[in-house]
């Protein structure tokens, strides 16, 4: 890859670059994508080729890659030039030179176009991420700088995406055209990618010294100072308030390592925030929203300072177009706010703020003392007042300082060092502190509670759902003397428990006694208790204590004594197992930590594809997600063929009784729609065999939430709410059809119950249960309407 440093004098640009007007027989039409206009642009293009073109070639194959690149090349240039004509004729590019006067010489447009086309052949996970990044970068560059190359890049990306989708649907008819639902995990990652890509746009624009945008006068300064330090001193000595003095200082302070690092600080901070967003940190979300608002304000301030006609209507239109990427990022952050609910301990935040305050005081003191003890290093002669007036500017990126008036000017190496690095050092400490804060354990207390619950459960006794109590989102009530605990969630003033109380190893009290103690605690807090998904024996104990019960789910339990699957009843199961053997599909019993990174990614991709086909958001509470698979006590059962293709995966939660594992409960189930059709039946049958080999008596296929057998459903308010919720979820999650499919194994059925005391609170209980499953997502309107209109039932 070769690049010319100065296109005005470069024979490379003259020989290869495309200028307007042009025609189809112009040889430059074919050579415009062969090289780049500057050395820096060539380096950036090389990066894009490594990141996008090389993987695309592996996906498409060499021949198809070459054909696609050629087609993208010959279609995107004419369309891009046509769009550039429209933009210029509408006077929507007022920031820089006429796009039609640009020289087009870059491979970036066909690289992005081919990557967009190849993304259609990627797994859903990477298809969405790749397209999001491509479109965010191209749109930001176009709106921020507005060159002919930017227009062509966006055009090529659109062409590649549309062509790729048409090709994908030609191969697999009936697939989705529009993207489906996102898991909470993927929503976080996609938001982080968007925020990072938007912040990277100005940096990428600054890497090109030929940029023609609203801030080109600032970004060009990064590359070469047009004045000497001596000339700046002369201008400022004559009149320190003159435009010539300020302009000379602006040019000098953009050049060198210090200013380069300072200009990268916003991107560095954004990357740190994006890492926090990917982990769902609420603080990262708040700071990211503030960052977008500050960016928009700074951009508008710069535009106003750089433009003489800021009251003109077309100026307003152009200004709005520049801030569109940040507005989009802000809108996405607001729309996806419910995915960022992981709160960080206020004590950790307070300690971090204290450390940052000390750092700021230290750097501010460094600046003040340097100006006072090194008076000859600055001009004019520094005073305490001038030092304090200049202090705020030391914490701003140099590109922003170009539109501000300075009070002091460095005139020696020591002065330049303090001038450039005072604020940069502070912001680097901010970035490191934020990283530690956002990537560490969010809540020490919550983490300790989960660890204590897991330790007590491993040595004590729980029910078939008890391992779910150590998942995130639960709150714990601890019995005196470590006798046990209750995991619960408070929604709408209702304390919804996750199963029954867990007994400690040395507990001298019964579950009924612990339940009574917890109810007293909840009553003191002003909550109403609803015991959710408890077994029949515990529900009878609550009836004796004055509760009412409602059957809410059916658990299917398989005996390991049937691991041979003999008899006519198990014909379908034997068929699934025989077919798996015939197709070379085998099972692996393992944990998440023991899987390779590649297999972990396959599981994540399979889960994302499963969720994308659902209209409802991913749920939680008693329904595990990929996040819960990493638990070291949770076992995974995978169906893999000889080519390492993942056909399906199930996860199994341990069930403890008096300190030992007595069985496992099925949680996550995912299958490849294009893979082995009977994979779930195969995996469940393999789980029964594993139970027998581990001397376990049973394996629970769990309960299908909100699916009750005919004749036992409740007709009252809460029954109607749960029935409607279950019916609405059925097409997307298949709980009821799943309950029917489990009958192939002829399991024992056990009811799970909801126990409640106050019948008047039934509507609130129904909505609270729904809120637990939907987590932070809003409840459907039809569900709220049912709760408020249906009559109560005793």
Curated annotation (Swiss-Prot):
InterPro entries: LPG_synthase_C, PG_lysyltransferase
Listed GO CC annotations: plasma membrane
Keywords linked to the UniProt accession: Cell membrane, Membrane, Transmembrane, Transmembrane helix
Major site of localization recorded for this protein: membrane
Organism domain of life: Bacteria
Membrane topology: Multi-pass membrane protein
Parts of the chain that traverse the membrane: 34-54, 67-87, 99-119, 132-152, 257-277, 283-303, 315-335, 353-373, 421-441
Classification via Pfam families: LPG_synthase_C (PF09924)
GO BP terms, alphabetized: phospholipid homeostasis
GO molecular function: aminoacyltransferase activity
Subcellular location: Cell membrane
Name of the protein in question: Uncharacterized protein Cgl0966/cg1103
């Amino acid at each position: 890859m070769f690049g010319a440093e100065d296109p005005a004098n470069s024979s490379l640009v003259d020989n290869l670059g495309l200028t307007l007007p042009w025609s189809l027989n112009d040889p430059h039409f074919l050579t415009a994508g062969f090289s780049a206009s500057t050395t820096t642009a060539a380096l950036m293009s090389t990066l894009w080729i490594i990141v996008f073109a090389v993987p695309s070639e592996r996906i498409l194959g060499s021949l198809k890659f070459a054909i696609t690149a050629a087609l993208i090349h010959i279609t995107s240039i004419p369309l891009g030039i046509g769009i550039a004509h429209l933009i210029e004729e509408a006077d929507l590019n007022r920031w820089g030179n006429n796009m039609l006067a640009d020289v087009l010489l870059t491979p970036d447009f066909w690289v992005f176009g081919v990557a967009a086309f190849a993304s259609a052949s990627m797994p859903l996970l990477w298809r969405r991420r790749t397209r999001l990044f491509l479109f965010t970068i191209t749109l930001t560059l176009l709106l921020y700088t507005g060159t002919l190359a930017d227009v062509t890049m966006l055009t090529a990306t659109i062409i590649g995406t549309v062509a790729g989708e048409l090709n994908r649907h030609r191969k697999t008819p009936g697939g989705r055209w529009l993207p489906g639902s996102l898991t909470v995990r993927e929503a976080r990652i996609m938001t982080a990618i968007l925020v990072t890509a938007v912040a990277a746009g100005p940096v990428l624009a600054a890497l090109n010294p030929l940029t023609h945008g609203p801030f080109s006068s600032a970004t060009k300064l990064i590359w070469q100072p047009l004045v000497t330090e001596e000339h700046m001193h002369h201008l400022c000595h004559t009149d320190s308030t003159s435009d010539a003095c300020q302009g000379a200082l602006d040019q000098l302070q953009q050049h060198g390592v210090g200013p380069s690092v300072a200009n990268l600080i916003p991107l560095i901070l954004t990357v740190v925030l994006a890492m926090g967003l990917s982990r769902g940190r609420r603080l990262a979300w708040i700071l990211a929203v503030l960052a977008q608002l500050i960016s928009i304000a700074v951009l508008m301030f710069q535009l106003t300072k750089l433009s003489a006609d800021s009251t003109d209507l077309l100026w307003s239109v152009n200004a709005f177009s520049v801030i569109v990427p940040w507005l989009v990022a802000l809108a996405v952050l607001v729309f996806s706010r419910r995915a960022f609910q992981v709160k960080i301990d206020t004590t950790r935040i307070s300690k971090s703020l204290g450390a940052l305050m000390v750092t700021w005081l230290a750097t501010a003191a460094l600046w003040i003392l340097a100006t006072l003890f090194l008076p000859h290093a600055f001009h004019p002669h520094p005073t305490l007042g001038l030092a304090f007036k200049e202090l705020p500017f030391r914490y701003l990126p140099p590109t922003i300082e170009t539109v501000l008036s300075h009070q002091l000017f460095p005139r020696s190496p020591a002065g330049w060092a303090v001038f450039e690095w005072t604020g940069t050092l502070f912001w680097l400490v901010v970035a490191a502190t934020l990283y530690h804060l956002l990537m560490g354990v969010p809540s020490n207390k919550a983490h300790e509670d989960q660890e204590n619950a897991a330790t007590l459960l491993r040595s004590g006794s729980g029910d078939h759902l008890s391992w779910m109590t150590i998942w995130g989102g639960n709150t714990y009530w601890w019995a005196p003397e470590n006798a046990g605990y209750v995991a619960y969630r408070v929604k709408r003033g209702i304390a919804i428990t996750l199963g029954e109380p867990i007994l400690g190893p040395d507990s001298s009290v019964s579950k009924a006694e612990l339940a009574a103690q917890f109810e007293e605690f909840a009553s003191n807090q002003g909550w109403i208790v609803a015991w959710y998904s408890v077994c029949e024996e515990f529900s009878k104990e609550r009836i004796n204590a004055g509760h009412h019960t409602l059957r809410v789910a059916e658990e299917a339990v398989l005996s390991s004594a049937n691991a041979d699957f003999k008899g006519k009843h198990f014909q379908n199961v034997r068929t699934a197992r025989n077919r798996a053997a015939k197709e070379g599909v085998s099972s692996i019993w393992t944990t998440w930590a023991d899987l390779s990174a590649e297999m972990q990614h396959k599981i994540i991709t399979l889960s994302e594809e499963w969720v994308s086909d659902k209209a409802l958001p991913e749920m939680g509470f008693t329904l595990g997600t990929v996040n819960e698979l990493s638990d070291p006590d949770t076992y995974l059962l995978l169906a893999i063929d000889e080519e390492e293709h993942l056909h399906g995966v199930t996860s199994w939660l341990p069930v403890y009784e008096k300190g030992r594992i007595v069985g496992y409960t099925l949680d996550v189930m995912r299958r490849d729609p294009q893979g082995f059709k009977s994979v779930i039946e195969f995996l469940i049958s393999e789980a029964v065999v594993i139970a027998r080999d581990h001397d376990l008596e049973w394996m629970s296929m769990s309960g299908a939430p909100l699916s009750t057998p005919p004749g036992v459903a409740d007709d009252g308010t809460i029954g109607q709410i749960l029935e409607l919720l279950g019916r609405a979820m059925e097409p997307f999650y298949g709980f009821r059809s799943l309950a029917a499919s489990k009958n192939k194994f002829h399991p024992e059925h056990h009811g799970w119950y909801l126990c409640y005391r106050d019948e008047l609170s039934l509507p609130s209980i129904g909505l609270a249960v729904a809120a637990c499953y939907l987590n932070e997502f809003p409840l459907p309107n039809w569900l709220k309407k049912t709760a408020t209109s249906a009559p109560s039932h005793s």
